[in-house]
Amino acid sequence: MEWGSESAAVRRHRVGVERREGAAAAPPPEREARAQEPLVDGCSGGGRTRKRSPGGSGGASRGAGTGLSEVRAALGLALYLIALRTLVQLSLQQLVLRGAAGHRGEFDALQARDYLEHITSIGPRTTGSPENEILTVHYLLEQIKLIEVQSNSLHKISVDVQRPTGSFSIDFLGGFTSYYDNITNVVVKLEPRDGAQHAVLANCHFDSVANSPGASDDAVSCSVMLEVLRVLSTSSEALHHAVIFLFNGAEENVLQASHGFITQHPWASLIRAFINLEAAGVGGKELVFQTGPENPWLVQAYVSAAKHPFASVVAQEVFQSGIIPSDTDFRIYRDFGNIPGIDLAFIENGYIYHTKYDTADRILTDSIQRAGDNILAVLKHLATSDMLAAASKYRHGNMVFFDVLGLFVIAYPSRIGSIINYMVVMGVVLYLGKKFLQPKHKTGNYKKDFLCGLGITLISWFTSLVTVLIIAVFISLIGQSLSWYNHFYVSVCLYGTATVAKIILIHTLAKRFYYMNASAQYLGEVFFDISLFVHCCFLVTLTYQGLCSAFISAVWVAFPLLTKLCVHKDFKQHGAQGKFIAFYLLGMFIPYLYALYLIWAVFEMFTPILGRSGSEIPPDVVLASILAGCTMILSSYFINFIYLAKSTKKTMLTLTLVCAITFLLVCSGTFFPYSSNPANPKPKRVFLQHMTRTFHDLEGNAVKRDSGIWINGFDYTGISHITPHIPEINDSIRAHCEENAPLCGFPWYLPVHFLIRKNWYLPAPEVSPRNPPHFRLISKEQTPWDSIKLTFEATGPSHMSFYVRAHKGSTLSQWSLGNGTPVTSKGGDYFVFYSHGLQASAWQFWIEVQVSEEHPEGMVTVAIAAHYLSGEDKRSPQLDALKEKFPDWTFPSAWVCTYDLFVF
């Protein structure tokens, strides 16, 4: 395969090869004439020539000597990528027409919005609060009753309010154990009048985190489910199976309510599949980011039924890798119910997720309509499917699935995907193998140039990554992290341009000093082959690892290879002219369009997460790495243009100038990370806990007592931006770890201590909640197997955390929590998350300690923290006064808590 007709320079090189092999010293005229005939070996004969002209075109004749215009090539590629990005953006803004209001069988987004506004008007709905347990539950039951009155006689509606108590351990945030008591689930079963033996579950949660109205997480999902219930119940089409709607009231308590339902409710045994509605952002499209496990028929159901699909197996594999610090009820149904399902979530605008800005007015009616159309169609499909009743028969196998710009979904079994992938690999092997196996007198130095070019490509990527990481580390060290958080284009201008400039520099140096005697067209072909080979290696690796995401590499190998096979004749005759470039870019349309589509999703999800990922992970290093990787992928099939172009000086100068100016502006603090813009806020998250701590010794005496406001910034910048506004919050009040206390002696709400190691402690008066916690040892006894059993009782607010640290020579062997086996958190301590609904009894539990030797300092240290997340007890005058001082670009989430430590 050739990139162009044989140039005079190439002919001279071929003559030189023949001369070295004993040919005549000068080619006769007839040999020169024969040289005009096209080669059939698929190679330009090695491409080596005499010294290149200063222009760097790599040849003397037309086609080889006429290089691409640098300005035209650079602008053309830039406009090409911008056009593709515009198409991606347009696909994300597809408008959905609302069904006629009140028309039976149509989802009405305005009715769902009415539900949403009523739920969010109640305010924050933490588990155990009257807002969650009484007001929201009452509203849901009221609306369900109205729906039941309007329902078609073909259907039967049953309603149950469940208040489960239970415990489980979960491998999340380093691992911990959860205990819940008397929390609330509202369960509705819609079934045929004669009943049903099988059911599909739809799940949402109506509780919210503290200090947030929780419109997207997850009131909008519950509103969608209410409207879907209304539409299905009024339908004149009979269902084959039941649809169970679970409105759970304790998801934000780390998935407690779903565990209570699936392990204790009598209807749980009917469920064969589920759909979980969640949020990681506010509005936009709802992404299918988890399916299964296995059960490919569920993906097929979504593909067949969803009207506005948005799904990706890539998102599934990224989420299940644990990179994203989040989890959903999907895990509970999968692990404790052994039920397959589909997990959907809104992912756009995660900047205001779990903040006071998560309000109903920020969720577009279009988003509600899209979600409602999809959920209604998929539930109806499952409720009338024969596969639901025999789900076990269709259990085995995974699916490769992805949507195409939201228009439709492509899905096929992963085993078929593996076959397709290896067929693509074989195509590359045949293509490259033909070149590698040809005699040297035909291929010249192709093998050597290919291997050297591969090394140059890898060096260019490595040095580019090192360059952007050096920039990112420097920016982090000078305190200018997250400069791109409110201005994403800053990251592109800083890290993206640096990556491209370094790649171009390395290849330009190679072109000038190593490949100085090779034709441009020959080098263009070599580096196209190198890019093809690299993507083929990715394809083999991902397929061998069993990752369904390998389909992306297959696309990035198959389409470029087909493009090369289609355009080589035109290029051979006319060189790198406009027609060739147009066909080349057209052939790259699908891989580049889909890559940009995925890259948008990656940054839409990960950029906001980096603003709440803790104080230990440098966000600039993470973002720079991701951006550099994406840039390397996008530039891979354009590297050959560096060798086809006459020069790269202007491009490198422009990129370097943009990078340098952006770097200076970032270092000077021009780009402030946060925003209080009412239309698009991007706040800094800060947790304020006004607490009183009491430490007791082995005899029960209080040996230490203090009080203050414990401050945690949830991003890498800590309090550096806050100190100028609130001078008393500075590094002189940095909190210090209590080495002998579990989790450093602080009242962690969740075990995220390993993510947030920098915190501050501002002295303040003691707190005195009206409902103070009580903790006592009920009994201490020795078991027949020589362990010590300690039984405790605790009472307090709806949320408490219990911590245990075993002393040297002691181990926790059993306890009455979870499955009976104690689970450690990161750092070796034990963490128990406790919550209750209304009117819960005292919490009694026991632990068993195995002691190998007597210790005068006791066996274990335990501590209990009480968190007041609702009502008057959550506030204090000092806390309110401090909150008022915070600038409007922050979101300070504040509550009162106590911490009591004991030694036994």
Curated annotation (Swiss-Prot):
Broad class of enzyme this protein falls into: hydrolase
Chain residues that bind Zn(2+) 2: D217, E252, H354
Chain positions with N-acetylmethionine modification: M1
Coiled-coil portions: none
A GO BP entry: cellular response to oxidative stress
Known EC number: 3.4.-.-
SUPFAM superfamilies, sorted: Zn-dependent exopeptidases
GO molecular function: metal ion binding; metalloexopeptidase activity
Cofactor(s) the record lists: Zn(2+)
Co-factor remark: Binds 2 Zn(2+) ions per subunit.
Disulfide bonds: C204-C222
Glycan-modified residues: N182, N730
Keywords, ordered alphabetically: Acetylation, Disulfide bond, Endoplasmic reticulum, Glycoprotein, Hydrolase, Membrane, Metal-binding, Metalloprotease, Protease, Transmembrane, Transmembrane helix, Zinc
Main subcellular location of this protein, as a coarse class: endoplasmic reticulum
Gene Ontology CC: endoplasmic reticulum membrane; membrane
Similarity-based family: Belongs to the peptidase M28 family.
Protein name, as recorded: Endoplasmic reticulum metallopeptidase 1
Organism taxonomic ancestry: Eukaryota, Metazoa, Chordata, Craniata, Vertebrata
Gene: ERMP1
